[in-house]
Amino acid sequence: METNDLGFVASLMFVLVPTVFLIVLFIQTNSREGSS
């Protein structure tokens, strides 16, 4: 089975984008709680 580069990139982004979003959100809440 040949690997489809476009499909691979699409699945990578599909997993990566929400993960990065959650990490950034988590860091922002932590810094807000720490500063206040």
Swiss-Prot record:
> Which GO biological process entries does UniProt record here?
photosynthesis, light reaction
Ranges in coiled-coil conformation = none
Membrane disposition: Single-pass membrane protein
Pfam families given for it?
A: PsbM
The secretion signal range is none
User: InterPro entries given for it?
Assistant: PSII_PsbM (IPR007826), PSII_PsbM_sf (IPR037269)
Q: What top-level branch of life does the organism fall under?
A: Bacteria
Query: What main location does UniProt list?
Result: membrane
Keywords associated with the record: Membrane, Photosynthesis, Photosystem II, Reaction center, Thylakoid, Transmembrane, Transmembrane helix
> What residues form the membrane-spanning segments?
7-27
Q: Which SUPFAM superfamilies match?
A: Photosystem II reaction center protein M, PsbM
Q: Where in the cell is it found?
A: Cellular thylakoid membrane
Q: Establish whether keyword Thylakoid is in the entry.
A: yes
Annotated GO CC locations: photosystem II; plasma membrane-derived thylakoid membrane
* The protein's role, per its UniProt record: One of the components of the core complex of photosystem II (PSII). PSII is a light-driven water:plastoquinone oxidoreductase that uses light energy to abstract electrons from H(2)O, generating O(2) and a proton gradient subsequently used for ATP formation. It consists of a core antenna complex that captures photons, and an electron transfer chain that converts photonic excitation into a charge separation. This subunit is found at the monomer-monomer interface.
Subunit composition and interactions: PSII is composed of 1 copy each of membrane proteins PsbA, PsbB, PsbC, PsbD, PsbE, PsbF, PsbH, PsbI, PsbJ, PsbK, PsbL, PsbM, PsbT, PsbX, PsbY, PsbZ, Psb30/Ycf12, peripheral proteins PsbO, CyanoQ (PsbQ), PsbU, PsbV and a large number of cofactors. It forms dimeric complexes.
Stated family = Belongs to the PsbM family.
Q: What is this protein called?
A: Photosystem II reaction center protein M
Q: Which organism is it from?
A: Synechococcus sp. (strain CC9311)
